[in-house]
């Protein structure tokens, strides 16, 4: 009987160790993600986050674990997004490191899972926003530059149409 109990205990320890290793592999994969990842419990408290999320939101593992995420991110748009429980779309908000001279834009999306838990994904879209602004400016400038010569040509054609032309 004692041999059987020992074998069962060893098998259980082996399964526990394998589960722990799988969990560590999973957390390492989340840590390597290019996106910020935050796991929230059913009350919105932080259970885990990766380094990217720490830099996006100014989080500290010693200080902020089990704190309510909405209390740490004081962006009114995010507070409304979080309270609405309508997570079909993402939210654009300023990052923690944003300054007037160096704005940082984050795309934040909450995904419900499990028993009321939330997965928060964030990504820095600053470069994307800047590229879109440059594209808009370029299109506006090009359309203005094209419109000006076309206006001159249209005026020239109108002038030619009003002049009496000889049959020569």
Report residues per predicted region.
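Signal-transducing coiled-coil linker helix
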Residues: 22, 29, 130-138
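Alpha-helical sensory/transduction surfaces in regulatory modules that relay environmental signals to outputs
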Residues: 56, 63-65
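Amphipathic coiled-coil signaling helices used for dimeric signal transmission
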Residues: 2-21, 25, 123-126, 130
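Short acidic helix/loop segment immediately C-terminal to the autophosphorylated histidine
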Residues: 161-168
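Short post-phosphohistidine helix in the DHp/HisKA domain of histidine kinases
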Residues: 146-161
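Conserved phosphoacceptor histidine of two-component systems
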Residues: 140-144
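Sensory modules in modular signal-transduction proteins
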Residues: 11-57
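PAS-family sensory/regulatory modules and their coupling/dimerization elements
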Residues: 65-127
């Amino acid at each position: 009987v004692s041999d059987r109990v020992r074998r069962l205990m060893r098998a259980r320890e082996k399964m526990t160790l394998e589960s722990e290793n799988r969990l560590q592999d999973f957390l390492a994969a989340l840590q390597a993600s290019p996106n910020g990842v935050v796991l929230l419990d059913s009350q919105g408290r932080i259970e885990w986050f990766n380094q990217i999320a720490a830099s996006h939101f100014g989080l500290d593992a010693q200080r902020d674990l089990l704190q309510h995420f909405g209390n740490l991110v004081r962006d009114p748009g995010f507070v409304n997004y979080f309270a609405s429980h309508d997570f079909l779309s993402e939210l654009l908000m300023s990052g923690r490191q944003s300054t007037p001279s160096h704005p940082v834009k984050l795309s934040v999306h909450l995904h419900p899972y499990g028993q009321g838990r939330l997965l928060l994904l964030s990504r820095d879209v600053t470069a994307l926003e800047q590229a879109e602004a440059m594209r808009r400016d370029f299109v506006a400038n090009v359309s203005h530059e094209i419109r000006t010569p076309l206006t001159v040509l249209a005026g020239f054609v109108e002038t030619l149409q009003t002049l009496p032309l000889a049959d020569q």
